[in-house]
Swiss-Prot record:
Its membrane topology: Multi-pass membrane protein
Database matches in HAMAP family: PlsY
GO molecular function, one term: acyl-phosphate glycerol-3-phosphate acyltransferase activity
Stored InterPro entries: G3P_acylTferase_PlsY (IPR003811)
Biological source species: Koribacter versatilis (strain Ellin345)
Residue ranges crossing the lipid bilayer per the database entry: 4-24, 56-76, 90-110, 122-142, 147-167
Listed name of the protein: Glycerol-3-phosphate acyltransferase
Length: 215
């Protein structure tokens, strides 16, 4: 427990840095939460018209997820079997905490983004090869349907299965459970998108006119 608490706290705080909010406030003197869906992620930052800031938000949100996992990996490399647990759990646990930080940032009254970019960084740090496959799936879905939300949902759902298929017994069962929980969180945060996909009212990409409540 003494091992997991500081890792959880640091990873959460790293993930909770609201780069989209900060960049829009800094460069546009505006509150991105007052635009489009009110989300702080890259998709909503793009709705401000600042495409460069949207790309930077995407990159920084991914980097913070990667950093959380990398820092946990460095930690277990320097400590001999901390807390007598399987050390392979710790990077995945840190990644989950970073995603939670992005979804529920303490700085913004626990109202954050949908976690796709942060999860990308986390998953890239945990298992780079599966990320290539999952990104291919995302790109294919968006290319065929023009729904970014659908691509994100399916990519998140596929990741733990792709990891298991490629690595089988290289990770303990708890690690796959943590990866699965991370994916479920992302899908849960897209529940309004799922409702619009079912209703046929979800915006396509590129959309000619943003719709309130979009991801």
């Amino acid at each position: 427990m003494k091992t997991f608490v500081p890792i959880a706290l640091l990873a959460y705080l790293c993930g909770s840095i609201p780069f989209g909010f900060i960049l829009v406030k800094l460069f546009l003197k505006a509150d991105v939460r007052q635009t489009g869906s009110g989300n702080i992620g890259a998709t909503n930052v793009a709705r401000t018209g600042a495409k460069g800031l949207a790309v930077l938000t995407l990159l920084l949100d991914a980097v913070k997820g990667w950093v959380a996992v990398f820092a946990a990996t460095i930690f277990i490399a320097r400590v001999s079997n901390p807390a007598n647990v399987d050390v392979r759990l710790i990077p995945a646990f840190a990644g989950l905490c970073a995603i939670l930080g992005h979804l529920y940032p303490v700085w913004l009254k626990f109202k954050g983004g949908k976690g796709v970019a942060t999860a990308l960084g986390v998953f890239l740090a945990l298992a780079p090869t599966p990320i290539g496959i999952v990104l291919g799936l995302f790109a294919l879905v968006v290319l065929l349907t023009h729904y970014i939300s659908l691509g994100s949902i399916l990519a998140a759902a596929a990741f733990p299965f792709v990891v298991y298929f490629l690595y089988r017994n290289q990770y303990p069962a708890a690690t796959y459970a943590i990866m699965g929980a991370s994916s479920l969180l992302i899908i849960w945060r897209h529940r309004s998108n799922i409702q619009r996909l079912i209703a046929g009212t979800e915006n396509r990409f590129p959309a000619s006119k943003p719709t309130e409540g979009k991801a």
